[in-house]
Design a protein with these regions (language model features):
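Short, small/polar-rich motifs associated with maturation and membrane association
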Residues: 1-327, 331-333, 337-339, 418, ...
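Glycine-rich, aromatic-lined ligand/substrate-binding cores of catalytic
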Residues: 814-849
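Short, solvent-exposed loop/turn motifs
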Residues: 23, 35, 64-67, 169-170, ...
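Extracellular/periplasmic, surface-exposed regions of secreted and cell-surface proteins
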Residues: 160, 175, 256, 277-280, ...
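Conserved small-residue
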Residues: 218-266, 348, 696, 713-815, ...
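Extracytoplasmic gating/loop element in the C-terminal half of outer-membrane beta-barrel translocons
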Residues: 260, 270, 457, 564, ...
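Acidic/polar loop-and-plug regions of large Gram-negative outer-membrane beta-barrel proteins
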Residues: 262, 339, 344-416, 615
């Protein structure tokens, strides 16, 4: 007993900050080798009982961890970790200390990026950066995520961000090679990149070997499966469909057309089209260095079988880089990358429709002589009769896509290579010159084949199409950098010049009439031939200068002049200036005697960027040779000249504040406004010109919003660590100018969005649904005049009509969300870790085009319909007077137009998604070191586990880009996203 008392001592003490001698709050104090611990109170004090001669471990974020012998009375001083304080953020052409940034930049490190196994960086960022909306338009393997930074500022030109990889614009990379990703969101940071940065910049820094480091090998492998998610999309089963059809037929006709034996057939066509798709990723990387050389090399394989049968992708990529000191004044960086990929698509768009539209009464397989199903898919032609037993084929689409998929295919193959040579010349310790030279080439081939043994109304004799594309690019960037410090004054500047040339070639050929199973073009009768050859060039010059005083006041100015061959000679040069300033308040003397705010910075920026992301040479009149005149090839005009085309221009303003409380809670708030002017639009012209439209600069759009981010280290003691982060971005989009101030429509597959001054760029324009008349079950629409105003009765109430053609369209919602964001958390204890990522979107409207045929009130009697019995929306069908129903009465061959384009099918697209959960274990160093390992991690990860949404389709996360065949927010037989389960292991030697 006395020995035990003698073995313990009571320890009291205070922990101080070495920089300002202030007590430190919340310092974690652990008895080394045990789980005993405590934290300091608000005055920096602690008290605990520990074994005599115990060693205390003190840790605090941003400070060096220290070990100290325990005594009864202790005064402990902790020093800041210079490496953390001087954390450098890569901006592509330059690097800036994080504390000294004057721009809106968010950096995410590899640890928070690689919890999602994906070949696409967009998925890695989803829900992790405020103001950045990442959308997966579907589940087709190989499709890239769509990224929007601070809204959409262009209608016809691309609004996607540009990637800068290791200082090279447009570089390629493998996600497993990523070290950090920085998202540049305002003109202060993006202005140096000019036109390419109109949609923002994503700066990727890849892993590299360090000079003087030992050789290490990293191995990573993940494997698992993916299942299709159908969300709230529920189709009728055999019984519900049978009873639904009973309401569409007269009793005598129903018995003849729909025999009771159909109730014995209940085929789930979706199960025939979809399966569990395998997904796997393997990566090996080697890095190391000698005194003057650092090297890194990796090889990666990614394979994914699509959940839709017959689809998938395979990709192999390699990366190698060398950093070498050639002389004291010269060093060199060399990097090469290659990617080889192959993608298989659904051989027909009809497959996604047929998976749900086919009647459950139709069996997809051939029946044998005994009436039993075989494993062979049945062939159906235009006669809509089964060849095996001559029963009717009830489905309206008189073909069997499962049979066709046995013979037909659509696929693409590509190979990309890039090389970078960079030389850094150090004239003095304050003056440096860098030249970066890049070369890249890419080859792609796409093939589409329809076998004559399958039924296709367009090509009963078979069809083959092949297209090939080749691209080559060369670029050089040359930058002179200098900087120095005189007392409290620091000055840095750089001046640079870029030049790039590129060439792209494309050829295509199609033919018909080949023999069965022969998919060679030379076995066909020529059907069409096409192609193009497009060269291009650009140059730019830029200047940037920055100044700070006392590490408290910072200002940066940038100017870039850029020329592009996309525009006519007199409009080729664009001028893009920008400026940014910040005040690091926490470095002021009056902030040194307080304990709560450990970092506080105000920042502001304003600048101009451009956009030239349109097809080349739109300013020229073009001719086509695809037409005949008197049976001879003739050149006919295909496009009007538009010689005054010029750059789209974006004026960007941003204000921000960065705060850190008690060195555990980081927070940022940003306000921004971006005015995009001189938008490139297709403007109507007089029919007498022989054309309907011409491309001109004729519009403006404004985006304004607020972004908020908070990251907190909630717990860091006793081997426990808990971090949590939340971010949200609110954006308002408004069209501020249209050609001649006249609104116009963007239309795809009969659905329209109106572009009008004062409205969102993606404003849905259609007739407004008013519900169902409870007295007779008729569909109702609100009465609207030609100007989009409601027609009111004498009492001032909205009036309705059951005549679809008696009313007009109006704006009924937008495809743009009000806000989006994410919540992410990481918990770890004693090697065990759990990472959880979520993302959310609110306030957008989705037009569910699929419902026009699958929720059609009798208009499509030979299509299966969406279930009302199993719907999660509480849908009901009108049956008798007095029913307050969501669906009108069903009528055979419905002519009420209840399924025509209207806001009936415009749905709330808001959702909250459990994006990813990763659970794993890091083996202790003491254990794995015996096997010469420096790291051994095992983990299990699951993606898309749950989604809360009211949307009746398969997934509310859909396309946010408008084009010739689609609109932002338009849902139409989309490839469903998948839920993925994978296991993985990472080992380092």
């Amino acid at each position: 007993m006395s020995m035990a008392i003698y073995a313990d001592i009571s320890v009291k003490g205070t922990v101080y900050d070495a920089d300002n001698s202030e007590p430190m709050i919340g310092v974690s104090i652990l008895v080394k080798g045990t789980t005993m611990g405590t934290i300091t109170d608000f005055d920096g004090n602690f008290e605990m009982t520990v074994p005599d001669k115990a060693t205390l471990q003190l840790s605090y974020m941003g400070y060096k961890t220290i070990e100290i012998r325990a005594v009864e009375n202790m005064q402990i001083i902790m020093e800041t970790d210079a490496q953390q304080l001087q954390e450098v953020v890569s901006l592509g052409y330059s690097a800036v200390k994080k504390a000294e940034l004057s721009s809106a930049v968010v950096t995410v490190d590899a640890e928070k990026l690689t919890d999602v196994t994906t070949p696409d960086v967009g998925n890695m960022l989803q829900g992790k950066v405020a103001g950045v909306q990442v959308t997966n338009a579907g589940g087709q393997p190989g499709d890239a995520a769509q990224i929007r930074i601070r809204g959409t500022g262009s209608i016809t030109a691309s609004a996607a961000p540009v990637y800068v990889v290791d200082g090279v614009m447009g570089g390629t990379f493998n996600p497993n090679d990523v070290e950090t990703i920085s998202v540049l969101k305002d003109a202060g940071s993006t202005g140096i990149y000019g036109a390419a940065a109109a949609g923002g910049v994503i700066v990727v820094t890849t892993k590299s070997g360090k000079k003087g480091s030992k050789v290490s090998v990293d191995l990573k492998g993940t494997a698992g499966g993916k299942q299709a998610l159908f969300g709230n999309y529920r189709m009728m089963d055999s019984k519900e469909l049978y009873e639904y059809h009973r309401t569409l037929f007269k009793p005598t006709t129903f018995i003849a057309e729909r025999p009771a034996s159909l109730l014995q057939q209940d085929w789930n066509w979706a199960k025939e089209f979809f399966h569990i798709g395998a997904i796997q990723n393997y990566n090996v990387a080697v890095k190391g260095g000698s005194e003057h050389v650092g090297y890194y090399a990796s090889l990666d394989y990614f394979g994914e079988d699509g959940t839709l049968k017959g689809t998938g992708m395979k990709k192999v990529s390699g990366h190698a880089s060398i950093k070498a000191d050639i002389a004291k004044w010269l060093d060199m960086n060399v990097k090469v990358d290659f990617t080889k990929s192959s993608i298989e698509y659904a051989p027909s768009w009809m497959m996604l429709d047929d998976a749900f539209n086919k009647m459950p009464w139709d069996c997809p397989y051939v029946y044998d002589a005994n009436g039993k199903t075989t494993k062979e898919y049945v062939y159906i032609d235009e006669h809509r009769e089964r060849p095996d037993n001559h029963d009717p084929w009830y489905s309206g689409s008189y073909w069997n896509s499962l049979h066709s998929a046995e013979y037909n295919y659509a696929k693409s193959n590509s190979f990309d290579f890039s090389g970078v040579l960079q030389l850094n010349v150090h004239f003095t310790d304050w003056l440096h010159f860098t030249t970066t030279n890049t070369f890249s080439t890419g080859y792609s081939k796409s093939s589409e084949y329809t076998d004559r043994r399958t039924f296709d109304a367009s090509f009963k004799k078979g069809y083959k199409n092949e297209s090939n594309g080749i691209s080559k690019t060369f670029g050089t960037t040359n930058i002179l950098k200098g900087g120095n410090q005189w007392g409290a004054h620091s000055f840095n500047a750089m001046i640079g010049f870029e030049y790039g040339i590129w060439k792209s070639e494309y050829t295509s050929a199609a033919g018909t009439g080949m023999p069965n199973g022969i998919d060679a073009l030379n076995a066909t009768v020529p059907y069409s031939v096409g192609g193009y050859h497009v060269p291009g060039a650009s140059w730019s010059a830029f200047l940037q200068a920055s100044y700070d005083y006392g590490k408290r006041y910072f200002i940066t100015g940038t100017y870039r002049a850029e020329a592009s061959s996309i525009f006519a000679p007199k409009h080729r040069v664009g001028h893009f200036p920008s400026a940014a300033a910040s005040w690091l308040i926490s470095n002021e003397q009056f902030m040194q005697n307080q304990k709560v705010v450990s970092f506080l910075k105000l920042r502001a920026s304003y600048g101009v960027t451009g956009n030239n992301n349109i097809p080349a040479y739109q300013y020229l009149a073009t001719y086509t040779l695809n037409n005949l005149y008197q049976n001879n090839v003739a050149a006919t005009s295909s496009r009007l000249a538009s010689p005054d085309l010029k750059w789209e221009t974006a004026y960007m303003a941003s204000l921000g504040i960065d705060l850190t409380f008690i060195k555990r809670i980081d927070m940022s708030i940003d306000l921004y406004q971006t005015d995009n002017t001189d938008l490139l639009l297709d403007v109507p012209v007089a029919p007498s010109t022989g054309f309907f439209k011409v491309t001109k600069n004729a519009g403006s759009v404004r985006n304004r919003g607020i972004e908020f981010r908070i990251d907190a280290n909630v717990i860091d003691m006793n081997k426990w660590r808990w971090d949590i982060g939340f971010n949200i971005g609110l954006n308002q989009n408004r069209v501020t100018k249209t050609p001649d101030h006249i609104p116009f429509l963007q239309t795809a597959i009969d659905v329209s969005q109106q572009v009008k001054e004062g409205q969102d760029i993606y404003s849905w324009y259609m007739k407004e649904w008013a519900g169902v008349n409870p007295d007779n079950g008729d569909p109702l629409w609100y009465m609207v005049d030609e100007d989009g105003n409601y027609i009111l009765d004498a009492a001032g109430n909205k009036t309705t009509t059951n005549d679809y053609n008696a009313t007009h369209a109006r704006v009924v919602g937008t495809a743009s969300p009000k806000f989006s964001g994410g919540i992410n958390t990481q918990v770890s204890w004693n090697g065990i870790f759990v990472h959880i990522n979520t993302n959310f979107v609110y306030g957008n409207k989705i037009y569910n085009k699929t419902r026009e045929t699958t929720d059609a009130d009798g208009a499509y009697m030979d299509y299966n319909q969406m279930s009302l019995v199993h719907s999660k929306q509480g849908w009901t069908r009108w049956e008798k007077p007095g029913d307050n129903a969501t669906h009108p009465k069903a009528i055979s061959a419905n002519e009420s137009h209840s399924n025509a384009v209207s806001s009936r099918y415009l749905e709330d697209g808001s959702f909250f998604r459990l994006r990813n959960i990763t659970v794993g274990y890091d083996f202790p160093t003491k254990l794995i070191s015996k096997a010469k390992m420096t790291k051994c991690r095992i983990y299990f990860t699951a993606d898309n586990l749950a989604t809360a949404t009211k949307f009746s389709g398969m997934d509310p996360e859909i396309n946010m880009v408008s084009g010739s065949n689609t609109l932002a927010g338009l849902y139409n037989s989309n490839y469903p996203v998948g839920r993925t389960f994978q296991g993985g292991v990472e080992i380092s030697f």
